[in-house]
Amino acid sequence: MIGNGLAAVIDVLYNSFGAFGAFVFAALLQPLVVTGTHQAIQGIEANLIATTGFNYIQGIWSVSIIAQGGGAIGMYLLAKKHSKDRDIAMSSFIPTLVGISEPAIFAANLKYSVIPFVCSCLGAGCGGAFMKLAGVRAIGQGINRNIRTSDRSTKIKLVFYVIGNLIAFIVPIVLIVIYNKNKKVFHMVKKEEEAESALTIDETAKSTSQKQLLTEKLLRLKM
């Protein structure tokens, strides 16, 4: 039932509303990942391939995933150098290159605020709209089966595929940096880092104090 409903909504968005529909579809894909309902889309893709020989959803999937990677890189740029947040953001970006967005979503883009996630969804929408305008279609499912390159027209489509993904990757980074400068929404990142720093200092002070007490006890025993 969920699959049939999703199939109807996707068909209307992509085929009836053009680039705007593709924007909405791409922007909403990763929220579906958060809820777990995205699994139903695999059946829709299989049906598209069986009936038409092509899969326009794969390109939308691609931009929605790499956009979350862009969000993680945006958080990487905002984090303090050599901090744990910076390491986590970079390590969560890498899986998006092979089609896995969950680490970027939960470890970076939703950690301090919903804004990075929203910026990533908007970036995905921009990439999805471009994919629709460029007419990019896949011949299979999954990240490894994008489009054929046997003739000149599909080689051009491959270039469009890459451009669409670059758009989806860059837009979230730009939006996150601009939003942070204007709204300071990521002040929580700095507060968290300050708290971690204060905790480290406190632990160091306690350790030093314990060592001093131990030294004093040893001196007393010798006396």
Label every model-predicted segment.
Residues M1, A26, Q30-Q39, Q68-Y76, ...:
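Transmembrane alpha-helical segments of multi-pass membrane transport proteins and ion-pumping complexes
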